Amino acid sequence: MKKLFGLFLLGTIFVLLMVRPVGAEQQLSVVYPPANHQTVADRIFLVGTAPPTGKVLVNGKPIERSRAGHFAPSFPLRVGENTFILQYQDRQVQLKVQRQDTTPAPPVGLAFGKDSLTPNVDIARMPGELVCFSAIAPPQSVVSVQLGKDNIRLLPQLQQAQLPANSALLTGRNQPTRQLTSGQYQGCTTLPELGNLVDGNNTITSGFTPSTGIQPQFQLTLNSQTVTQPSPGKVTILSPANLEVVEVTANEGVARTGASTDYSRLTPLPKGTQAAVTGKEGEWLRLDYGGWINSKETRIIPGAIPPRSLIRSVSARRVSGATEIVFPLQVPVPVSIQQGDRTLTLTLYNTTAQTDTIRFDDDPTISRLDWQQVTPDRLEYIFNLKSQQQWGYKLRYEGTSLVLTLRHSPKIQNSKFKIQNSKFQVSDFQLPCTGAQQCAPTDSPLAGIKILLDPGHGGKETGALGPTGYPEKDINLLISKLVREQLARRGAEVYLTREDDRDLSLPDRVDIIDKIEPAIAISLHYNALPDAGNAMKTKGLAAFWYHPQAHDLASFLHSYLVQKLNRPDYGLYWNNLALTRPASAPTILLELGFMINPYEFEWIVNPQAQQQLASAIAQGITQWFSNIEINS
């Protein structure tokens, strides 16, 4: 996993090594926190190692260590500089950790808080929409904002619930907190119709161009003194009769629930999708169906009117290993996909049906296609499926026709296994064939199955570091190769995204999955924590999924590995990760243990445990395929 303690923490940690001439057996090392690191967390853990004999002291007190001498104690942090002195015999490591105060600094004198005025980027909205403003000002101030001829009073907000980051779930600290917010002022207004908003001597009458927007003027009055400051962002009212139309230029336009990468993802929009723009916030565009997209993934279509389409007939065609359903449209419209148990629902926006005829012959995957006009401009197609397990889908536009590809069940070439698969079992850690033995057909329960393994990280991206400095990228690759060997002995056709220590971007890994189209894809990782976690007490195996088609695989493998290996259970998670998002195959990510936990790290680097883990993963995959109806 892209390590949380490297992502969620900012920082400056000053590390001073006071080295004395001692023997190699007296080495003391600290691998976390790194140099130049600061944090907003209220605690931090120190990960490192020293020879197992003797004691390691932190600020004069002995700390807990594993049998091999590894340690990862946590300590509270006060705001400001915190000093830790680690000592083993005559070697010392001094750490200075800076905890930042997240409370906004109150303004000094008659002034607004620094960078506190919002909107802080240009925004555009439709007439009648609610727009809100906020500022930080001295207590007892009278604060307002002038928007054209409208004056909006901003009122003090004495208490607000603060939500922690998503990563707080990983440490069990994800509950909202109530905070007194002295000096926080907020207020909202409904935007008027065009022609009713006056800016000086100008009446705002049209458009999306920022130059036609109004810059809100914030006013603060305290002790009979007044100061005025313009907002960093302008407000523009869009004309419903003159909306811009954009086309998605990315292969998969990233649609979100709001105007930043903090917001959740929606179904990606296929290249060529067209939609009207009904809102803007900085570089983000709100499309007419409700999703937001970064303007860098679009182009403006000059003179285009808001896209609307009719649809009449629908047809299906067989291709190798899949069924393609073709929806002839007048214009490429926004779409979304929702998977359920034995169903897949395709939604077409800005579309109205004139459908009398659909041809849909008997299909290996689909039992029936239903449809309904949910609203005058929103249409749903419900695919009723023959199997509960789905094997992947793709969306693309060919001209103005939408093509939905639904993959068929993989076919196991071992005919004997196809008959007996419901009874197939393997004992713990037993290999169907070993060494120079040739696998007979009955020894190849995964014959004909393509499986992709993704060893996480690589190259400059080390991933998490164990107490000795051993990088996650290396153990990810080692375990992936061991799993490949065991899957191949069971007859599977196994692919790795990388065979050696190299840089490989997340998009490149996703492209490999989409190109190979395996039956399943598994990204293999080891875990770490944000600073607020307890590295000494946290360990175990976790599985992550995103699309419903991957849930059963993630759930089964997670439970199987925890039980067969007698490992701690760190949980089953829905998570928006790059290597769980591919829709072309059931794709999951496994976190096989915590690199930063001193005790679990000893299990991670144990060669016998590595072989057992690889065997259990291969057996779990084999058992999962035997449990599902893949040849119905």
Where are these regions (language model features)?
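Short, glycine/acidic-enriched capping/hinge loops at junctions between secondary-structure elements
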Residues: 59-60, 464
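Aromatic-lined ligand-binding clefts that engage carbohydrates, nucleic acids, or primary amines
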Residues: 48-50
